[in-house]
UniProtKB/Swiss-Prot annotation:
PANTHER family: AMPLIFIED IN BREAST CANCER 2-RELATED (PTHR13091), NONSENSE-MEDIATED MRNA DECAY FACTOR SMG8 (PTHR13091:SF0). Keywords: Nonsense-mediated mRNA decay. GO terms for biological process: nuclear-transcribed mRNA catabolic process, nonsense-mediated decay. Residues 563-604, 633-671 are annotated as: Disordered. InterPro entries: SMG8-like. Involved in nonsense-mediated decay (NMD) of mRNAs containing premature stop codons. Probable component of kinase complex containing nonC and recruited to stalled ribosomes. This is Nonsense-mediated mRNA decay factor SMG8. The keyword Signal does not apply. It comes from Drosophila grimshawi. Belongs to the SMG8 family. Pfam families: Smg8_Smg9.
Length: 945
């Protein structure tokens, strides 16, 4: 490379020795602006021109360096901007925000300012690219330049320039000309040969690509006044540096200089020289390294020497000096002077004015202009260039509109929170199809807010949860007497004959009482059956209420009471306070209060049992004398013991034993206190009766049902339960399980007088022997919400028809805890949980009564019938015990589990073993053909192994 002397200085200062040289040019000064990218530490893009700044030069954003070669008409302006790598690094170090979009927008706006200054003060703009290919991002920059010039600058720049010393020199276009843009690529592709043909071909291809893009986006147009830039029509405007090393290693340059000083050209060798060379120790000795003088430069070498940036630039400078700058670039030439060559002084004056308007005043934060357009330019320049921001904002708004439309389109008249969340999720998916970018998060928040307000605008459902956890679907803003979830269950009546549609209950009364009373009117069997009357609350005043916390929920304070007062004192205090309570009434004579005595004396009326044949049973068995109705004194003692000890699993399994023999021995009666249980008539029990709730508080309504649906003959073990009698049973699961029991009565010697009083019928009955073979049929019925009913053969298996009937008996269901919930075997996509709803008992034709004492363990509660005297089922009859549909403890509704794990089927609750007991029928009752009285006594349970 040949080095020439040049001058360099920083704008706006002009060296004293350079100003006269520039003034000598008069109106032949061509200003060339150099912009673009650089990678060196000095931000120098002038390396292609063989120019370098001083070593002490410090790059800065917006700084302008001027270069001039004496003897030329070209003034080079080097613009340092954020596209220079070193300047961008400085901005990164100054950056405090982590928002990349904001940082990128600021860097781009600062570069656009420098480009605007170059377009209005230069005749030729040279864009230097460090890459090997054209960057399409420059097209976007040019579009922004065109937008800013046409929408902002032309609104204020010509007017403001007239107010400066520049006056009307630049005219209405406010620039010297439509600047011609040239492209210089510092690096040539490595995979392309560096020959004249390949270099020219590559340059032409790049020119075609650039021209096509500029014409496509209206950067270069047919009219000079409407075009942002100009491209020469018949001249090269793309240059690739294929030969020259722009930033060589200085050490290598020093070595090359040393070799050049030692270089000596070969001359024609004489014969004497040949003789001298023959004396050399080896070939080439003392022969200089270099080309022979006869060697001439090839065409490729000549092309490389002439293919320089300076020569490339001077061809376009020459067009400007000759006045043919716009010829060939535009088809339509403007009437105004298209091109102006100014002297240095005039140009410098215009440069100062334009620089102050476009760059200088922007940096002054206190500057205020009276021109509204110019003030808007100073204030909103960066925002107006942030097209990505507008683009992301437009996408977010478009996605927001589609998301809101999708939400409203799928919205019903009223809907709940679950539907709202699902529709909002669908609307979010619709939004994400369009909306993205930095505004997506704000748009999503707005979408959520708009959809929420739309939902709350009269479309919100009540959503009060039912006892099964289903929300109410009635409008929230409209008053309604009762809730409705819209969920309908199929359920049977008390006797099981009629199936009906049950609305999802919201109160305990709806679940356990009202529905069955409604079905009793519709069922022609329920109106005929004899039902056991459970004790319920009978108010004595009009303003009765639910029991207070301490009275209604004694379970929470039981431990404190047990520690505070002894058992004996508690009994005496209770008797003393009984007469002083005006809101209480004594129980009937058939329900005497149990005496708080030791268990040995309290159980005098219960009969000891002895099981033979190795049977394993768990039930209550007793014989009753004349005073049967006085034998219920142990009821409260038993409940107190169970409450203290907790719910225990008394079940034992007997898979092989099918017969049982029970020995009944009537005990001698003893005198008992006639204590009375004080039943409250002003406060009722809000929940279900359980082991620790006491007997002084009664519920408003019975949650259980016990009914005799007919004689035992209505059930045939060969056909099972017929559809006309019990509807809804699954095929093969409509059978009861047999329970074979042998009972032996041992009569003590002091009862001989009582035996003589028995009638002949009883005597004939006794003559058959002291053993009675009883066949009882038992069934544990489960019912799912779809109305499917089935019996269980064991705690783990459903009854499957004839084969199970022949092989199994009821020992597995009697001697084991039965689960309260079990998966329904019906074929459905979703597994429904069936609930234990009924217990079927077919009593035998024998002088014994079956006693029911169900205890349902759910969570920490053990629910009972709440009777002081246990129900005693009559002989030769079909009895059905209907269990509660919903269980409520002291202060909570116990919801059914969502699913039952096969490894722990009792987790959702169970009915404890020891449900059934057997008692001998009184002799007086045998003489009467009617069904025994519905006043029974509680018996003490025993387990035998």
């Amino acid at each position: 490379m040949s080095f020439r002397k040049y001058y360099s200085w920083k704008y706006p200062d002009v060296p004293e020795d350079v100003a006269p040289l520039l003034l000598e040019l008069k109106n032949s000064l061509v200003v060339v602006g150099v912009v673009g990218r650089s990678k060196c530490s000095l931000a120098n893009k002038m390396s292609v021109f063989g120019m370098q700044p001083e070593e002490t030069h410090e790059p800065a954003n917006g700084q302008i360096m001027c270069y001039y070669k004496p003897g030329t008409s070209t003034l080079l302006l080097h613009f340092e901007s954020t596209h220079d790598e070193v300047v961008l690094g400085q901005k990164l170090l100054e950056q405090t925000s982590i928002d990349f979009d904001h940082f990128y927008g600021n860097m781009r706006s600062q570069f656009v300012r420098m480009m605007l200054l170059a377009l209005h003060t230069c005749h030729i703009v040279v864009y230097v690219e460090t890459g090997q290919t054209f960057d399409p991002a420059l097209v976007t920059i040019c579009q922004l330049l065109k937008y800013v010039r046409e929408q902002h600058l032309l609104e204020f720049l010509p007017q403001l320039l007239r107010e400066t010393s520049a006056g009307n020199l630049l005219g209405d276009r406010a620039r010297l000309c439509t600047p011609r843009i040239l492209f210089i690529f510092e690096n040539y592709p490595a995979d392309v040969e560096k020959t004249r043909e390949f270099i020219s071909t590559h340059e032409f291809q790049t020119e075609d690509k650039i021209y096509e893009l500029f014409r496509q986006y209206n950067i270069v147009m047919q009219s000079a006044s409407n075009s942002l830039l100009a491209l020469p029509n018949n001249k090269q405007f793309v240059f690739y540096n294929a030969n020259e090393i722009l930033r060589p290693d200085r050490l290598l340059l020093a070595i090359d200089a040393l070799n050049a000083t030692m270089y000596k050209q070969d001359v024609k060798e004489e014969e004497e020289d040949l003789e001298i060379i023959a004396l050399a120790p080896f070939e080439g000795f003392v022969k200089p390294f270099g080309d022979a003088y006869t060697v001439r430069k090839s065409d490729e070498q000549l092309y490389r020497e002439s293919h320089t940036v300076w020569h490339f630039l001077q061809r376009h400078v020459q067009d400007a000096l000759e006045g043919c700058f716009d010829e060939g670039s535009f088809k339509q030439l403007s009437q105004s002077p298209p091109f102006q060559l100014l002297n240095f002084k005039t140009w410098h004056m215009c440069m100062v004015s334009i620089h102050k308007l476009l760059v200088g005043n922007v940096e002054d934060v206190n500057y205020v202009s009276t021109n509204a357009h110019y003030q808007a330019y100073l204030r909103d320049f960066t925002e107006s260039l942030n097209y990505e921001k507008r683009f992301w904002y437009h996408l977010s708004e478009l996605g927001l509109k589609k998301g809101i439309s999708a939400y409203k389109h799928s919205a019903a008249v009223t809907y709940g929170s679950a539907a709202h969340k699902q529709m909002l999720a669908n609307a979010t998916l619709v939004f994400e199809e369009e909306g993205r970018g930095p505004y997506a998060e704000l748009a999503l928040a707005k979408l959520n807010d708009v959809c929420l307000r739309y939902w709350h605008d009269g479309r919100q459902q009540c959503e009060f949860p039912s006892l099964r956890g289903n929300p109410c679907i009635l409008p929230r803003d409209v008053s309604h007497d009762k809730h409705s979830s819209g969920v309908v269950h199929i359920s049977s009546c008390n006797c099981g004959r009629t199936l009906g549609r049950r609305e999802d209950p919201y109160t305990l009364r709806q679940a356990n009482y009202d529905y069955y009373e409604h079905m009793a009117v519709m069922c022609n069997l329920c109106v005929k059956v004899k039902r056991f009357q459970f004790p319920v609350f009978t108010p004595s005043i009009s303003d009765y209420r639910a029991a207070a916390f301490e009275a209604a929920f004694p379970l929470l304070l039981q431990a404190h009471k047990n520690r505070a007062e002894p058992q004996v004192e508690e009994d005496s205090d209770q008797e003393a306070n009984a007469a002083e309570e005006p809101y209480s009434q004594p129980a009937t004579e058939a329900e005497p209060e149990p005496e708080k005595e030791p268990q040995a004396s309290a159980n005098e009326w219960s009969q000891p049992m002895s099981a033979t044949y190795g049977s394993d049973l768990n039930m209550s068995i007793a014989g009753f004398g004349v005073s049967l109705k006085e034998g219920g004194a142990e009821a409260e003692v038993e409940e107190a013991e169970v409450c203290d000890k907790g719910s225990q699993d008394n079940s034992t399994s007997s898979d092989t034993s099918t017969e049982s023999e029970i020995e009944l021995q009537p005990k001698e009666r003893s005198a008992q206190k006639a204590n009375q249980i004080l039943i409250s008539t002003t406060e009722y029990l809000p929940g279900l009766v359980h082991m620790c709730s006491g007997l002084e508080l009664l519920p408003l309504f019975p949650s259980w049902s016990l009914a005799c649906v007919g004689p035992s003959s209505i059930y045939s073990h060969n056909t099972g339960l017929q559809e006309h009698f019990q509807s809804g049973f699954l095929s093969g699961a409509n059978y009861l399980l047999p329970w074979d029991v042998q009972v032996r009565l041992v009569q003590p010697h002091y009862k001989h007088q009582q035996q003589q009083l028995m009638g002949k019928k009883n005597q004939r009955y006794r003559k058959q022997g002291d053993r009675l073979a009883l066949k009882i049929f038992i069934g544990f019925e489960y019912e799912c919400s779809r109305g499917h009913r089935f019996m269980m053969r064991s705690p783990e298996r459903v009854l499957r028809g004839g084969a199970d009937i022949e092989r199994d008996t009821s020992t597995k269901v009697i001697n084991n805890n039965m689960p309260l919930y079990f998966p329904c075997p019906c074929r459905a996509q979703n597994t429904f949980l069936a609930q234990l709803m009924r217990i079927h008992v077919v009593t035998p034709k024998a002088p014994v009564n079956i006693i029911l004492d169900p205890k349902v363990l759910v969570g920490k509660y053990t629910f009972t019938l709440g009777c002081s005297i246990l129900p005693m089922l009559s002989q030769s009859a079909y009895w059905i015990l209907r269990l509660p549909y919903v269980y409520q403890g002291d202060n909570e509704i116990i919801a059914p589990p969502e699913k039952i794990e096969p490894t722990n089927r009792l987790a959702g609750g169970c009915i404890l073993a020891g449900l059934f007991g057997i008692a001998e029928t009184e002799s007086m009752e045998l003489k009467e053909p009617r069904i025994t009285s519905m006043t029974f006594t509680r018996l003490q349970s025993h387990a035998y192994k």
